[in-house]
Amino acid sequence: MKFLCRALCVLLIANCALFAQRTEESIGDFEPLDDDLVLYIPKFAVKLGFRGLTGAKTAFGGTGVLSGRSFLGADTGVDQRGYHDGYVAFDSRTVTDPAGNQVPITPDGRTNNWGFTDSTQATADGLMEFHTYTATTSYASFQEKDPPAAFGVELSVEREIGNVFGTRMKWGVIGGMSINQIATSTSAELNADITTITDLYSLGGQAAPTAPFTGPFPAGGVDNTPLIYSELLRRSSQTANSTNAVLSNWKLRGAYLSFRAGASLFVPISERFSAAFSAGAVLAYAGTTYDVNQSFKPNTGDTIVDAMSSADDALLPGYYVDANLQFAMNETSGLYLGAVYQSSGDYTQTVTSEDGLSKYSTRVDLSALQGVRAGVSFKF
C-alpha cells in the first residue's frame, strides 16, 4: 500500500512537470518580437514667438489750401459779411414807439453790429480793414520717413514629409501668420501763396475802439456801441508768396497681417542643435489710417487750422525666406532664433479735405522687410 502511494505521488509530480514544460513552450511561441514594436516620431511642429521687422518705408507729399471761415457777401453796398478778423452785420438798434414797443430805428447808413480782433485793422485815415486769408501750399514732393522697428507676434505650423535623398536632412511644408504694426509721423514747413482779400469801411471820423471789440455793447441798458458805416467802400485782393508759411503734420498708423506658406528644410548639427530654412509665398493685408493737420498764422486773427483723415487697406502678394537655429530642450519642445526677409510690395493712400481743395498722399513700401524672429516650438 505504501509502495502504491509513493508510485502515485511520483506519477503526479511527473505529470505536473510535463504540463509546465508544455505551457512554457506554448507561451514562448507568442513572445513579442522587435518587429512588433511601433516607435512614434512626431511629424508636426508648432512655433509661437515674436517677429521684429525693419525696412518699412513711408513717404508723404501733396498740396493743400487753407482758408479762414468767412462769408464775404456782395463786393459792394450793404450786406452781412464775416471775415477772419471781424464782421459787419445789419444794424440792430431799436427805439421805443408811442405804444411802448421796441422797433428798428430809421436807417442812417450805420450799424452797431460789428467787431474786429486786432488794433492794426484801424487805419490812420479813420477806416477799418477786414481781411480774409487763403494759403495755397506749393506742391510738397514726397518726403521719406521710415518707421522704427516693429515687433509683433507670429504663429506657424510645420509638417515633416521625409528625408532628402536618404540623408539626415529632412524636408517639409510650413504655413503661418504674423502681425506687425506701422507707426510713423513727420512734419514740414511749406511755402505758400497767401491771398489776402481786404474790405474797407468808414468809422465816420471817430476813433476805433480798443481791440478786440465785439458789438453791440450795451452799458446800463443804453447801447453805447461805436458805430461803423454799413456800406462797403472798397474791396481789394493781393497774392504774395511766403516762405515756410504753412506747417503740415503727417501721421500714419496701422498694422499689416502676413500669411505665408512654403517649403522647409531641416539640417541636424548635433544631438540638440539643428538649422532650419524655409521659403515661399506671402500675402500681406495692410490697414492704415492717414492723418494730416495743417496750420497757418495770418497777420491778423487766429491761426487757421485744418485736419483731415482717411482709412485704407490693401492686399499685397510677395515672398519670404528665413533661416533659423534650433535648440531641442527635450524630444517635444525647443527654442528657435533666426532671421527673416519678406517682400510684400507697396501701396499709396490719399486723404482729401472736405472742400476737396487739399489733397495729400502717403506711399507705404513693404517690399524690403528684414528682421529677427525667436520663440518656442512644440512637436506632436
Task: Describe the function of each predicted region.
Residues A59-T63, T120-P148, Q181-A255, Y285-L316, ...:
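Extracellular/periplasm-exposed beta-strand and loop segments of Gram-negative cell-envelope proteins
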Residues V153-R159, G175-M177, F259-V267, A279-L283, ...:
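Residues on the lipid-exposed face of transmembrane beta-strands in outer-membrane beta-barrel proteins
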Residues P148-E154, K170, G254-R260, S274-A276, ...:
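Transmembrane beta-barrel architecture of outer-membrane proteins
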Residues M1-Y40:
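Cleavable N-terminal export/targeting peptides
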Residues Q21, E31-P42, P147, E158-V173, ...:
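Short loop/turn motifs that connect adjacent beta-strands in outer-membrane beta-barrel proteins
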Residues L53-A150, A314:
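Surface-exposed strand-loop-strand hairpins of Gram-negative outer-membrane beta-barrel proteins
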Residues T23, L366-F380:
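Outer-membrane beta-barrel "beta-signal"
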Residues F50-T54, M177-A183, L257, A281-T289, ...:
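Transmembrane beta-strands of outer-membrane beta-barrel pores
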